[in-house]
């Protein structure tokens, strides 16, 4: 049986087995590793986040793919394990901290996340994770959204 992250996407320690590639976020020197099938959404989101929310500073606190469990779990694979999640400016938005973004930017963060089919860790019910953004759609809906946003050739 193959592994999946908790959002249902294929996960593996073998990056190539699940189509993990590195992509440069336009307008930055930051490279993020993510699943090829979701890359247009994650990288498109990161580009707009950089322009509209805050610069992705490139200080080695921006991540994508990483095979691991959810922090604090022993049996729940993180969405990073499937290359379907990003952490942006983690040094400024630590796990468990609340209110790390300018309050005026929060509605824009939510709108951008929705536009790109993502769930924002700042909206988690329990432990907040304001640096974290993850794919909240299945493969068919991801493909449809990529076409709708005209990211097919991105």
Q: Model-flagged regions — what are they?
A:
Residues 13, 51-58, 116-123:
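Short secondary-structure junctions
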Residues 73, 77-86, 90-154:
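Catalytic cores and adjacent binding grooves of peptidoglycan-active enzymes
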Residues 1-55:
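Active-site acidic/histidine clusters and adjacent loop/turn architecture
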Residues 40-84, 92:
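Active-site-adjacent loop/helix surface patches within enzyme catalytic domains
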Residues 5, 64-66, 115:
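Intrinsically disordered, low-complexity N-terminal regions enriched in serine/proline/glycine
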Residues 10-13, 27, 36, 69-74, ...:
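Solvent-exposed, flexible loop/coil residues
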């Amino acid at each position: 049986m193959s592994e999946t992250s908790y959002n249902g996407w294929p996960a593996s320690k073998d990056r190539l087995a699940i189509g993990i590639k590195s992509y440069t976020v336009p307008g930055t020197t930051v490279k993020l590793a993510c699943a090829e099938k979701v890359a247009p959404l994650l990288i498109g989101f990161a580009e707009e986040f950089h322009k509209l929310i805050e610069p992705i500073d490139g200080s080695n606190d921006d991540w994508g793919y990483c095979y691991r469990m959810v922090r604090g779990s022993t049996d729940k694979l993180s969405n990073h394990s499937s290359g379907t999640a990003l952490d942006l400016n983690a040094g400024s938005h630590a796990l468990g901290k609340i209110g790390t973004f300018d309050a005026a930017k929060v509605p824009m963060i939510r709108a951008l996340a929705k536009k790109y089919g993502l769930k924002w860790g700042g909206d988690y019910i329990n432990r907040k994770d304001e640096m974290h953004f993850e794919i909240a759609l299945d493969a068919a809906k991801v493909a449809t959204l990529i076409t709708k946003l005209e990211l097919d050739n991105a």
